[in-house]
Amino acid sequence: AEDRSSLSGVSDAEAKEFHALFVSSFMGFMVVAVLAHVLAWAWRPWIPGPKGWA
């Protein structure tokens, strides 16, 4: 039997591999989300200027 078993049942190497994939996927998602917000802001800003929406 193993001395150190994990709750999830995955090995340390598998956990590190999953973590690397998760982090890179999350960073890709964040890049897409930030780009979408920048494009939406350029199209139609959601905070009015000093003179309001006019």
UniProtKB/Swiss-Prot annotation:
It is a single-pass type II membrane protein. A bacteriochlorophyll binds at H19, H37. Residues 1-20 are cytoplasmic. It comes from the Bacteria. InterPro entries: Antenna_a/b (IPR000066), Antenna_beta_CS (IPR023623), Antenna_beta_dom_sf (IPR023624), LHB-1/5 (IPR002362), Light-harvesting_complex (IPR035889). GO terms for biological process: photosynthesis, light reaction. The keyword Membrane applies. GO terms for molecular function: bacteriochlorophyll binding; electron transporter, transferring electrons within the cyclic electron transport pathway of photosynthesis activity; metal ion binding. SUPFAM superfamilies: Light-harvesting complex subunits (SSF56918). One of its GO terms (cellular component) is plasma membrane. Residues 44-54 are periplasmic. Gene3D superfamilies: 1.20.5.250. The keyword Glycosyltransferase does not apply. It is found in: Cell inner membrane. PROSITE patterns: ANTENNA_COMP_BETA (PS00969). The chain crosses the membrane at residues 21-43. Keywords: Antenna complex, Bacteriochlorophyll, Cell inner membrane, Cell membrane, Chlorophyll, Chromophore, Light-harvesting polypeptide, Magnesium, Membrane, Metal-binding, Transmembrane, Transmembrane helix. Antenna complexes are light-harvesting systems, which transfer the excitation energy to the reaction centers. Belongs to the antenna complex beta subunit family. The core complex is formed by different alpha and beta chains, binding bacteriochlorophyll molecules, and arranged most probably in tetrameric structures disposed around the reaction center. The non-pigmented gamma chains may constitute additional components. This is Light-harvesting protein B-880 beta chain. It comes from Rhodoblastus acidophilus.
